[in-house]
């Protein structure tokens, strides 16, 4: 066939009418048809990815979510229930097809958890992420500063979420962000100051747009922003934000409020109704405002819950009962070297007693166990011994006063 008579096998255009005509074995295709085909493939691919994401995101009912949390988190029954409902409502909202006729807009159920260090706030977020198969970014609020100052700006949060999602934008936009130590960005004072609070109220203002839902330009691969750079547009509307913090001293704010409310009531009535051993259970949004969070942030974290302090019984259960309990992990580690690991009840109680005495929390249990077992994990793999039994005297010998003091300093 003469070159002048060549034509596109799809649209029939002659070669002179095209910018480019590509030949195959028995057919030809022009540049316009290639462009059109590319658009069709891209749209099909986008829809396929969306369907895949919805298929991957297995949404369970609130009771099923709580049951999953129960296998990893000991205690905190009320918080697990509140979290299960909030997470269920959030992802139920995402999976619901949008209709233009539907004028009821369901807002996000962002969450704030208040509780002492080591009570399980981060573990809750990690467990939810694992169950739903969605990416999770854990961010320390203490390193955040206002844009333009030394430190990480709030948009770096989304960079971390993209990294957790392997730079899949679709996955990232359905992910979870856990902001740890939210209390550390509380407003330092109600009084105006000449010195700018770049790591406090300024960061809170920066977080607002992320929490409420907006499109943010994020530098790819965590790079610095510069004018010629291509950005990734991330829509935060469907990202679930979970914030946590110890809020040291908020108990005094709660107690003061409760004492003011108790005026006019008899002391006996107040004693019957208030549990002074766990004041956090009475927390309300007003207390967060008094602590130093701005009202706008509080309004965008509508689900408020608390973590109960860990008593001796709960800490004991954390050591042995969860699916990934600390003692079970050490059993598995020793088993990899064909060593049978055993620990007496008295030794377990001693480790728990030290965690309570020095207020190390659940996180401190791991550090205490590591201090007790390290020498054995160093020596036994090179020896002929096939059993390692930890008794109370052995634990006492390994947990000297100096060792515990060091652990307390870093906890």
Where are these regions (language model features)?
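AAA+ P-loop NTPase nucleotide-binding core of proteostasis motors
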Residues: 2-33, 38-137, 141-150, 155-411
């Amino acid at each position: 066939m003469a070159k002048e008579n060549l034509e596109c096998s799809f649209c029939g255009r002659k070669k002179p009418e095209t910018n480019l005509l590509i030949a195959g074995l028995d057919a030809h295709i022009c540049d316009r048809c290639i462009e059109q085909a590319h658009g069709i493939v891209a749209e099909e691919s986008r829809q396929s990815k969306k369907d895949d994401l919805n298929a991957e995101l297995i949404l369970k009912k609130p009771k099923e979510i709580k049951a999953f949390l129960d296998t990893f988190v000991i205690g905190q029954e009320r918080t697990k229930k509140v979290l299960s409902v909030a997470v269920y409502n959030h992802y139920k909202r995402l999976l619901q097809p949008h209709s233009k006729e539907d004028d009821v807009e369901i807002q996000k159920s962002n969450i704030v958890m208040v509780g002492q260090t080591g009570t399980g706030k981060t573990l809750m977020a990690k467990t939810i992420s694992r169950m739903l198969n969605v990416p999770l970014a854990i961010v320390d609020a203490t390193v955040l500063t206002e844009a333009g100052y030394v430190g990480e700006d709030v948009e770096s949060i989304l960079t971390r979420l993209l990294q957790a999602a392997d730079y899949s934008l679709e996955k990232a936009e359905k992910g979870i962000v856990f902001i740890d130590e939210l209390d550390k960005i509380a407003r330092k004072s109600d009084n105006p100051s000449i010195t700018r609070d770049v790591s406090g109220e300024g960061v809170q203002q920066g977080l607002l747009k992320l929490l409420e839902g907006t499109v943010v330009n994020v530098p790819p691969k965590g790079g610095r922003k510069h004018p010629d750079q291509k950005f990734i547009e991330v829509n935060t509307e469907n990202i679930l934000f979970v914030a946590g913090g110890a809020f040291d001293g908020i108990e005094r704010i709660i107690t003061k409020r409760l004492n003011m409310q108790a005026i006019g009531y008899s002391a006996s009535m107040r004693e019957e109704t208030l549990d002074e051993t766990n004041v956090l259970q009475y927390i309300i949004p007003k207390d967060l405002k008094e602590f130093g969070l701005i009202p706008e942030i509080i309004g965008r974290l509508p689900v408020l819950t608390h973590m109960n302090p860990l008593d001796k019984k709960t800490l004991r259960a954390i050591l042995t009962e969860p699916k990934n309990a600390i003692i079970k992990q050490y059993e598995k580690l020793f088993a990899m070297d064909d060593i049978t690991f055993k620990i007496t009840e008295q030794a377990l109680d001693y480790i728990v007693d030290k965690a309570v005495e020095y207020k190390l929390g659940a996180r401190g249990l791991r550090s205490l166990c590591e201090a007790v077992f390290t020498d054995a994990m160093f020596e036994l793999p090179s020896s002929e011994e096939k059993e390692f039994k930890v008794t109370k005297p052995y634990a006492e010998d390994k947990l000297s006063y100096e060792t515990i003091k060091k652990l307390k300093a870093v906890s």
